[in-house]
Amino acid sequence: MIEALLKKMIKVGDLTIHMPNGSVVKAGDGAGPPVTMRVTAKGLRRLVTNPSLGLGEAYMDSDLTIEQGTLWDLLEIVGKSGGRTPKRGSALKRARKAFKRTVQSVNDRIASRRNVAHHYDVSNALYERFLDTDMQYSCAYFARPDMTLEEAQVAKKAHIGAKLNITPGMKVLDIGSGWGGLSMTLAADPGAKMTGVTLSTEQLALATERAAKAGLSDQVEFRLTDYRDLDETFDRIVSVGMLEHVGAPNFRTYFETVKRLLTDDGSAVIHAIGRMSGPGATNAFTQKYIFPGGYIPGLSEIVKAVEAAGLWITDIEILRLHYADTLREWRTRFLADPDIPTMFDARFLR
């Protein structure tokens, strides 16, 4: 019965599974690079009862080991078996998904700080080892295919700066300012008066230190502040890689706050990850281990929230393939760094 279920779950690829009882299950259509994995009894229970969470947890705990191929090969098989064509589903399924989306993303101020700390306060030293030298933790802009990650992140900041159309002396708010690289760039040229807000104590400390070393303390101020608590206005607002932490129930509040904080002739550039299809729910593994409270929005959700807030959309740009290249660079650097394995235990690294 379990073997039949596994074969039903895996529709494509070439997957061989060594079962706890010694039997071997072949699944998929045989196409692509072969992958062989071995599961313990505990790992098998996890896979069958809750695949979206169980696959990752089984791998982390070594209840699932890969003997041929790579983890990325396995994930490709699993992803393709899940299908790429959006299915609308029944009204009940859509209602369940909407309920799950809401419950997962109730991000009040306390929850927001806790969720940000879970991901960003792990260790600045970790991020320094696989990000670019400016510590840009968001999609780079590969204007040319031969660009290095450093060059692509410089191009990303220039691309955003061009969209913002800042003139010297403008007050600019950076929502989710991270380690401060974008704020410092816009302060240096074209000379904006930057305010960056973050909920991460680790990011705040390093960003403040970096601004001081660069001689930009008079041009850039970083605050440990929830964006919803700001009460001043700005000529421009930029937010890169932060909307994913807002949560679907708070999209309208987010854009209403953006409108409230902008001057009458102000404008904002919001840069975020977007899901391929319409509204959905966050993967269980991502929700538990990577971005608690996070939710990747569908474009339709963003447009609706922007319009409801009374803002005008003047430009939409899709950078999906640029993020694929960015993630590839991060993964390569993470795996190649000799110090990272000494900083964390095997479960964290897996």
Feature roles, as predicted:
Residues R252-D264:
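A short glycine-rich, Lys/Arg-flanked "PGG" loop and its adjoining helix->strand segment in the class I
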Residues R228-I237:
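A short acidic, Gly/Pro-enriched loop at the edge of an enzyme's catalytic core
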Residues P168-G176:
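Conserved class I S-adenosyl-L-methionine
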